[in-house]
Regions:
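N-terminal helical capping/dimerization or prosegment-like subdomains
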Residues: 2-83, 246-250, 264-267
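Metal-dependent amide/peptide-bond hydrolase catalytic core
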Residues: 4, 11, 174, 183-292
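Short glycine/serine- and small hydrophobic-enriched flexible loop segments
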Residues: 22, 118-125, 207-214
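Short helix-capping segments at alpha-helix termini
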Residues: 47, 126-129, 275
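A structural signal for short hydrophobic beta-strand segments in well-ordered beta-sheet cores
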Residues: 51, 94-96, 231-234
């Protein structure tokens, strides 16, 4: 196969910016990234790169990959969250202003995605490298989905280390907090709003929410700081004149290396009256040694 990958910095940079503009213009919400996966796959193939695909994950090995050498993974994601109501620009129209490229996913994590691809293409045809390179543009990062990087890691073999592109203000990150989503339900007694009722499920939920807001976990991580709990969703009632007997709310919990997700859930249950159930314990905090 003819090798077409560019090998000069200027061309790589210009191509990366154009690719990022094209990615921004295509909606790629988590689990709906098929069109950006198509674009990335086609782009690499046009550069002479043999690609592999599983669902919306695209990856490639450098041309002279050798099983005898250690391997570096270059990884970032091409899915995005949905734009919020505060957007002042069209999220799908890439705009260059004051030397910056604006658009949904330009920073998280399109910039890193195309930069790592440029680095991969630069070394793609190189001979006598000390390391192999694998480039992986993966899906479902924003929703911590099961069909993202976790699902394709077995295809990569043993890795010496990975460079994962995320917007960290160009600071090396060696640890990340875990994530646990907890669904809670406060109970009360239903009645007409005109009647006296001191067992309003909403008020009962608010007492628990106040504890969640103010509680400080005793142990603080040297690298990750404190466990953070934030109530992000609350629902109750359907009629203005009826006191609801249930109030549900959701807690976004960011855990550290000081507590497992299961330990945090146990602490929550011991301190609130609402029922509390974790959607998953899968995403505990992770880190590598400070002197790595």
């Amino acid at each position: 196969m003819e090798q077409k990958s560019p090998n000069n910095f200027l061309e790589l940079g210009e191509n990366a910016v154009e690719l990022l503009k094209n990615l921004i213009s295509i909606p790629s919400f988590s689990k709906e990234e098929d069109k950006t996966a198509d674009l990335i796959e086609k782009y690499l193939q046009e550069k002479g790169v043999k690609t592999h695909r599983e669902k919306n994950n695209i990856w490639a090995f450098n041309h002279n990959f050798s099983p005898e050498k250690p391997t570096i993974l270059l990884n970032s994601h091409h899915d995005t969250v949905r734009p919020n109501s505060g957007y002042t620009l069209d999220p799908f129209t890439p705009i260059v202003k004051d030397g910056k490229l604006f658009g949904l996913g330009s920073n998280d994590a399109g910039g890193a995605l195309v930069s790592l691809m440029a680095a991969f293409l630069y070394f793609y045809n190189a001979k006598d490298l000390k390391y192999n390179f694998i480039y992986a543009a993966t899906a479902e990062e924003e929703n911590s989905g099961l069909d993202g990087v976790e699902s394709v890691l077995p295809h990569f073999g043993n890795l010496e280390f990975a460079i994962v592109g995320e917007p960290t203000e160009m600071q090396m990150a060696i640890a990340e907090k875990g994530l646990m989503v907890v669904d809670c339900e406060a109970s009360g007694t239903s009645s007409h709003a005109a009647h006296f009722n001191d067992d309003n499920a909403i008020y009962n939920a608010l007492k628990d929410i106040e504890w969640i807001k103010n509680y400080q976990f005793p142990n603080t991580s040297e690298v990750l700081g404190d466990v953070k709990m934030t109530v992000t969703v609350i629902n109750a009632g359907k009629l203005h004149n009826m006191v609801p007997n249930t109030c549900t709310f959701t807690i976004d919990v960011r855990t550290t290396d000081q507590y497992s997700n299961r330990e945090v859930l146990q602490i929550i249950r011991e301190n609130i009256k609402s029922k509390a159930e974790a959607r998953s314990f899968r995403l505990n905090s992770s880190s590598i040694p400070l002197d790595h």
